[in-house]
Every structure is written in structure tokens, then in C-alpha cells.
């Protein structure tokens, strides 16, 4: 009996202590060691910032590092519009960067599906055989540029209309983070995890946007895809680099 009472008392003490620890743990937000929101968030005060964060950048939104020397975010409505534009373009840039590199990588491994260089692939529609998706005529086969453009406009219009209107009628979903059927893995179920994923998304999206800009410049300057440009640079860094190509565009005496 004494053993049972002692065990019960010990169990009660343990449960109380565990409950306090659990409550304290639940109260503390999850963190990766760096704050991304609020006044104590990580900041990047770039040129002409006078080492001060504008009052209108409060750290409420993901990707806010406190730098806005041009005052682009001063007006709330303009800021809201720019946030939407940046995020949508960042997502397209991530898909685009992946799409620019994947065909070249597959072609290097021996996969044959027509033109692998991203800025040359579309021109295959003007060839005699037309454009075959992945080089397979049984998949998507395109020969008419007008019909292809019309289909793209219609499909993109439907998708954008769906997004802007918040998804299916009556659901009222967030046009930027709709969730539900757009999040089948439940990545946004936990609010703290979701908040951190928003930051990761916009950071990687900004990097992808710069990557796409670089791919465009490479296409104009070298006439090659990003993977081939990387291979050329690694093979001979002193000859194949940005500085060497830049000299070709400088006026000569």
C-alpha cells in the first residue's frame, strides 16, 4: 500500500512537471535559430539605407529584410500589389530555372527528345515535323504557332482567373497561399512551419529570378544553355567567364 501511494504521488509530481514543460514548450514558437518576422528579425540594410529600417517595414510579411531605399513599399496598396507580383513571378522563376536546366541534363545522360536548349526548343514548332513534347509524337504534338499560342492564353487565363478569384466559387481562399487542395502534403498545417516555409519560398524565388536573368544574358552572349555554359566554365575558367565575355561588348579604340 505504501509503495502504491508513493508511486501515485511520484506520478502526480511527474505529470505536473511534464505538463509545465509541455505548456512552456507549446508557448515557444518553433525556430531555426534565426528570426524572420518582427522587429528583431534578420535585416539586410543595403546601400543608401542610412542603416535604418523604414517604419512601414515591420517584419509582418515573409522576406522583409528592412531594405527599401526607393520607397516602393511605402504605400500599403502598392506594397500589397508588389508582394503578389513578386511571389507569383518568383514561383514561375523557380519552375523556369528547373525547366531550363533539366532537358540539358537529360540530354547529357543520353536521353533523346529533340532540342534540349531552352531558348531553341520553341523554334522546333516551325520545323517540318513540328514540335514533339519530349521528342515523342504520341504526347503533345504542335505544328501551328497560332493554335498553340491560343491554347496557352486560354489555359493561363483560366488558371489566373481561378487564382485571383480565390479558387472555386464560395471558398474564398487566399490568392497567394490557397492551401487545401493546393497543399496535398499538408505542409502548411503547422502555423510555425508554414511561416518559415513562406520565407524559404520567397528567398529561393528571388534567387531563381536572378538565375533566369542570368540564363537570358547567357543565351544572348554565348548562344548556349546554362548547363553547357557551366561545363565550358569549369573546363576553362580563365577563358569562359563573365569578365572575358564582357570585353567583347566594350568599345575599342
Swiss-Prot record:
Primary localisation category: plastid
Annotated chlorophyll a 6 binding sites: 233, 242
Binding-site positions, chlorophyll a 2: 89
GO CC terms in record: chloroplast thylakoid membrane; photosystem I; photosystem II
Residue ranges crossing the lipid bilayer per the database entry: 92-111, 139-159, 207-227
Keyword Transit peptide: yes
Post-translational modification: Photoregulated by reversible phosphorylation of its threonine residues.
Binding site for chlorophyll b 1: 44
Positions with a binding annotation for chlorophyll a 4: 204
Binding site for chlorophyll a 1: 67, 73, 86, 206
Binding site for chlorophyll b 5: 152, 249
Residues binding chlorophyll b 2, per UniProt: 91, 140
List of residues binding chlorophyll a 3: 124, 134, 201
PANTHER family named in the record: CHLOROPHYLL A/B BINDING PROTEIN
Similarity comment text for this entry: Belongs to the light-harvesting chlorophyll a/b-binding (LHC) protein family.
Protein's job: The light-harvesting complex (LHC) functions as a light receptor, it captures and delivers excitation energy to photosystems with which it is closely associated.
UniProt name for this protein: Chlorophyll a-b binding protein of LHCII type I, chloroplastic
Annotated organism of origin: Chlamydomonas reinhardtii
Amino acid at each position: 500500500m505504501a509503495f502504491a501511494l508513493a508511486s501515485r504521488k511520484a506520478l502526480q509530481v511527474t505529470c505536473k512537471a511534464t505538463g509545465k514543460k509541455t505548456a512552456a514548450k507549446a508557448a515557444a514558437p518553433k525556430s531555426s535559430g534565426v528570426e524572420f518576422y518582427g522587429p528583431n528579425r534578420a535585416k539586410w540594410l543595403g546601400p543608401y539605407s542610412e542603416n535604418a529600417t523604414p517604419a512601414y517595414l515591420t517584419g509582418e510579411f515573409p522576406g522583409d529584410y528592412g531594405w527599401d531605399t526607393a520607397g516602393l513599399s511605402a504605400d500599403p496598396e502598392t506594397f500589397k500589389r508588389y508582394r503578389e507580383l513578386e511571389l507569383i513571378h518568383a514561383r514561375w522563376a523557380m519552375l523556369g530555372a528547373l525547366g531550363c536546366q533539366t532537358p540539358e541534363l537529360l540530354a547529357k545522360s543520353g536521353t533523346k527528345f529533340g532540342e534540349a536548349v531552352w531558348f531553341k526548343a520553341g523554334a522546333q514548332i516551325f520545323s517540318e515535323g513540328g514540335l514533339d513534347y519530349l521528342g515523342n509524337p504520341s504526347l503533345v504534338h504542335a505544328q501551328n504557332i497560332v493554335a498553340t499560342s491560343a491554347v496557352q492564353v486560354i489555359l493561363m487565363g483560366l488558371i489566373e482567373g481561378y487564382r485571383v478569384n480565390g479558387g472555386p466559387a464560395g471558398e474564398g481562399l487566399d490568392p497567394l497561399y490557397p492551401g487545401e487542395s493546393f497543399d496535398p502534403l499538408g505542409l502548411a498545417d503547422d502555423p510555425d512551419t508554414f511561416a518559415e516555409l513562406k520565407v524559404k519560398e520567397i528567398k529561393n524565388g528571388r534567387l531563381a529570378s536572378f538565375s533566369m536573368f542570368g540564363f537570358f544574358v547567357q543565351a544572348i552572349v554565348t548562344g548556349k544553355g546554362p548547363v553547357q555554359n557551366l561545363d565550358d566554365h569549369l573546363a576553362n575558367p580563365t577563358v569562359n567567364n563573365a569578365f572575358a565575355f564582357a570585353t567583347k561588348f566594350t568599345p575599342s579604340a
